[in-house]
C-alpha cells in the first residue's frame, strides 16, 4: 500500500477514534440516567414498586440497559474496524 492510502487510512482511523469518544460519552449519559431511574425506583415505597409506576420504571431501566448494550456493541464494532484498517496498512 502506498503512503497516500496509508495516510487516508490514518485519517479514517482518527474519525473512528472521535466516534468512539462520542460513544463513550453517550454511554456515560445513558448509564447516569439508568442509575437515576434505578435510585428513584428503589426509593419508592414497596407497594408502589410493585404497582404500575414501579413496572414503568423497571421497563425504562430495562430499555436503558438495552440502549447501553447497543452502544457497547457499536463501540466494539468500531474497534474491530480499526483493527482491520490497521491490518490493511501493513
At which residue positions do the language-model features occur?
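Long, low-complexity or tandemly repetitive, helically biased scaffold regions used
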Residues: 2-90
